[in-house]
């Protein structure tokens, strides 16, 4: 069972639930409203949507014909780093100029009790399915980071799973780790979607298959896959550090780190198309644009 948000031709935004065959509109403005109503009714989001599906007509349009939006407008997106061996290896490569000759703080954080967690994005910087992600104009080495996202209540309860892209500049971070916020955060540097999978419908959250494909001029130039079984840490451990002495917004998204890194000689280019597919969540597709073509004001 997956929750989506979409825009009607009138411009009206609706949340909806899909069982893959059909799409049923929900009377909620977004996923967190559904979660809160289920709490008030002392039921679960799954039971609530199942009940609603018996009393509303499905849309005439199919899922693939809808204009999807971010599945929730997360006020904050946070992200974890170096939670997979592949990320540690890639970070060491960029920090040592490819020499990999000495232990780094990335080795340290991979093994440390405290995970790396950083602030990634705000609602205004985050885009949804089929919307453009943007390249930084002062970086020559940029990649998508395909990651599983945890959807959290303000108490830190995991109520859903989504897919996310932690767009990153390997040259800026590699030059100096203190540049991390600049390597990670700019307009259009984060995407989430296409849906939220209800947590209670996932029997093993350490068995998500993650696939990343990048297309250039119609050709597939990157094709990588990974599985959340390779994650070094537990989700509860990551959330525990995020909520510690912190206040969360309802619907905060926590990206759990990347295990797919394109080849070291690869950098994203204007016109590329990124696809991030997570089993049971769907395909998050984003065209890549250079900042020169963007016209926004945040
Ligand atoms: O240490 C930098 C961040 C690494 C990261 O974003 C990841 O592992 O996904
Ligand atoms: Mg990342």
Residues covered by each model-derived region:
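A generic structural motif
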Residues: 30, 165, 227-228
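Short acidic-glycine loop/turn motifs at beta-strand connectors
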Residues: 7-10, 17-22, 152-157, 215-219, ...
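Buried hydrophobic positions in well-ordered alpha/beta secondary-structure cores of metabolic enzymes
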Residues: 3, 15-16, 81, 150, ...
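Catalytic-pocket segment enriched in acidic/His residues
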Residues: 9, 170-298
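Active-site microenvironments in enzyme catalytic cores
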Residues: 47-216
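Short, acidic/polar N-cap/turn motifs at the starts of alpha helices
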Residues: 1-3, 12-13, 147, 209-211, ...
């Amino acid at each position: 069972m997956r929750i989506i948000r979409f825009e009607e031709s009138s411009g009206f935004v609706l949340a909806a639930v899909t069982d893959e065959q059909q799409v049923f509109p929900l009377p909620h403005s977004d996923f967190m409203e559904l979660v809160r109503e289920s709490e008030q009714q002392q039921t679960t989001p799954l039971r609530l949507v199942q009940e609603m599906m018996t009393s509303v007509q499905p849309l005439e349009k199919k899922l693939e014909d809808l204009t999807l939006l971010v599945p929730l407008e997360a006020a904050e997106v946070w992200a974890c780093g170096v939670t997979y061996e592949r990320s540690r290896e890639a970070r060491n490569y960029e920090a040592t100029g490819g020499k990999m000759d000495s232990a780094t703080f990335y080795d340290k954080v991979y093994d440390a009790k405290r995970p790396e967690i950083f602030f990634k994005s705000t609602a205004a910087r985050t885009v949804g399915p089929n919307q453009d992600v943007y390249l930084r104009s002062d970086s020559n080495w940029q990649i998508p980071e395909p990651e599983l996202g945890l959807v959290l209540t303000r108490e830190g309860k995991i109520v859903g799973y989504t897919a996310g892209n932690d767009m990153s500049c390997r040259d800026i971070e590699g030059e100096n780790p203190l540049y991390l916020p600049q390597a990670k955060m700019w307009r259009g540097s984060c995407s989430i979607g296409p849906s939220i999978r209800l947590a209670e419908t996932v029997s093993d959250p350490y068995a998500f298959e993650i696939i990343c494909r990048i297309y250039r001029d119609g050709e597939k130039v990157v094709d990588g896959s990974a599985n959340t079984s390779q994650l070094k840490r537990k989700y509860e451990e990551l959330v525990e550090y995020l909520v510690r002495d912190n206040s969360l917004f309802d619907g905060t998204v926590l990206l759990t780190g990347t295990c797919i890194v394109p080849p070291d000689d690869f950098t994203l280019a204007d016109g590329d198309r990124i696809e991030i597919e997570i089993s049971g969540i769907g395909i998050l597709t984003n065209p890549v644009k250079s900042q020169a073509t963007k016209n926004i004001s945040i």
